[in-house]
Amino acid sequence: MLTHLNGYKREAVLAPLFKMLEATFDLFVPLVMADIVNVGITAHDFHYILVRCGILLLLAAVGLACSLTAQYFSAKAAVGYSTSLRHALFEHIQRLGFTEMDTMGTSTLITRMTSDINQVQSGLNLFLRLFLRSPFVVVGAMVMAFTVNVRAAWIFVVAIPLLSVVVFGVMVITNPLYKTAQARLDRVLGLTRENLTGVRVVRAFDKEKSEIDRFESANDLLTRMQLHVGHISSLMSPLTYVIINLAIVALLYVGSIEINVGGMASGDVIALVNYMNQILVELVKLANLIVQVSKALACAGRVQAVLDTEPGMEFPAALKGEAPADKAGDAVRFDHVSLTYAGAGAPSLTDISFTAKRGQTIGVIGGTGSGKSSLINLIPRFYDATEGTVEILGRPAQAYPRAALRGSVAVVMQKAQLFGGTIRSNLLWGNKNAADADLWAALETAQAADFVRAKPLGLDEPVEQGGRNLSGGQKQRLTIARALVGKPEILILDDSASALDYATDAALRKALAALPGDLTVFIVSQRAASLQHADQIIVLDDGRMVGLGRHADLLKTCPVYEEIYASQFKKGDAQK
């Protein structure tokens, strides 16, 4: 992760150097104050006092300039570092496969991208300003104390190690606790995201109370951990103040004895107390630095864990091999394919075999959890088969570069997802170079042209994030049109017409069949009516293929398909 600081090496060096320069000027302030008391006030020399006060103002002004310069460089380095790290993390996440995304979870990745990197940025900013300054002032104040009075300076030698034990002891104890607290924060964020995403379902089933209880339980665990860490961290300040105040009392006692015997002047005592106060201030800063850096290191470790996660699948740089002549007509071929998700106890698909020819329409039907989405997710290689082989257009799916495979296979997901922008910008996801004529052709096929024309701005009509200003059916038709803009060779509709009425659904299927070329269409649907005219229908039950054939044949040979069909049409044969 430190490589992201390479572009800011100059700032990372100059920030602590200017802070040390500021600290150097601060260390001379007590000596000047001692001179004012020992010489100016004792001799009633007003001119001497004014000159020394001018020196104090000059030291303060130069110190302020150094401090502002250091702040500028540290902020520039920290912000630049976090920006580079955030870009790298986002780019890495884009390369991760569905398996890794499923394992880590969306809420976890959002936390890494936002609060974790912000914490790293704050920690780095503080570190660059204080990691040299605070120790330098602590050691420098002790050295300067020896120049004032050796006997009194030994109090510093005793106080500083005691303070260090307190500060570093708290750090060692709290560092692992911060990691636990952050993990519990992830849990709270995950529950929040899940609840807000499914708020309609929660209210539809009157589950607000149970969701509140679940959130309060997770939030209570987080609160208790944060309080536990806070209680331990809060010990640092009183313990350090007790040690410092005892040291000041000792200084005053030793100073009074030394003054009585003529070993030091009263101004020297003031200088020593000032040095002790400087040590107190810097150790408080150092304690805060350690706490913040501990948090930042914990967050950095979590970000690094994501960066260390390698994609589970690799794509070749170029297309491998030629499609065998005997498979030239194949669009998709599954050969004894099984799929088990990472961490799952049982396979989601078992021993699936079929061949879809170019230009065919393939229906996929089955009950909830039967493996329909799992099957079609293997075609664009969102996941790799655990067993068996998946061939696309005559070649193994692993032979295709990512762009080539995703360009040949277009998927319309179950959940219609649109992005903030315009209708045009969303459609151009399919092909950024598509002309307006191509966009309108795709809209016509997707049965979306009429409602887009009815919009005041047509293709330039704004689309809110997630398509909130569109109905469910409109969003589904636009996502289908977006897939068609890319002119794929294989189109997968994963239950993506569920919000369409029967007439629009039928018109969509008719328009897809009329498209030129050999477009192979996979239609995943709960409606048997949507699949009646498919060239082949795959019937799934509990991850196994229990039927394969045309509609009429399956009614005779596949009890599962017959049951699905009967459950949908026994009350309304007019829908056949």
Q: How would you name each of these model-derived features?
A:
Residues 325-576:
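ABC-type nucleotide-binding domain
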Residues 6, 12-69, 73, 146-151, ...:
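Transmembrane helix-loop-helix hairpins at lipid-water interfaces of multipass membrane proteins
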Residues 1-9, 109:
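A short amphipathic helical element positioned immediately N-terminal to and/or at the very start
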Residues 44-51, 144-158, 228-302, 306-307:
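Helix-loop-helix
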Residues 17, 25-29, 54, 66, ...:
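Hydrophobic alpha-helical transmembrane segments of ABC transporter permease domains
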Residues 43-44, 79, 87-111, 115-117, ...:
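Short intracellular "coupling" helices and adjacent cytoplasmic loop segments at the cytosolic face
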Residues 7-10, 95-99, 115-128, 132, ...:
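An intracellular "coupling" helix at the cytosolic face of ABC transporter transmembrane type-1 domains
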